[in-house]
Amino acid sequence: MNDLRYPIGQFTYKRPITEEMIDTWIQEIEDLPNELTKAIKDLDQKQLDTPYRVGGWTVRQVVHHVVDSHMNSYIRFKLALTEKNPTIKPYKEEKWAELPDSKLPVDVSLVMLDSLHKRWVNLLYSLELEDLEKTFNHPDTGETKLAAAIGLYAWHGRHHTAHITSLRKRLNW
């Protein structure tokens, strides 16, 4: 049986990272607001409040989490572009998913995601090759180059979209 936590597998990539890979990943980041919107289209409130797996987040929480995560990533990129290997602040995503705003309508986060991604993608397309080598330091996972972080967040969006689409398929929604 497939691991419901990782419907598209865990994040991996071939090295070296090529310009073609970067372009593909940026396009996936650009497409995410539309893909996530399509994934939840026509779901009712009960469906939005259904966990994608036993012990997992609800569809609603997944949508809000994507925005929380990508807001953090956008800030990490800006820090890495303006400081030398900044140490970024991790956040407790599982606790964020329990905060009151995670119960808001998903449209609130979809609007935020669309606006955020417009700014983020504009920034990503402006990066020079030397910018892609810039890094940030995560206290738990260490140093990350921006090139790899682009791939990680492209995967992250597809990963959570697949949580929703695979749930819909399993439950025939």
From Swiss-Prot:
It comes from the Bacteria. Binds 1 zinc ion per subunit. Its main location: cytoplasm. GO terms for molecular function: hydrolase activity; zinc ion binding. Keywords: Cytoplasm, Hydrolase, Metal-binding, Zinc. Belongs to the metal hydrolase YfiT family. Possible metal-dependent hydrolase. HAMAP family: YfiT_hydrol. This is Putative metal-dependent hydrolase BCE33L2441.
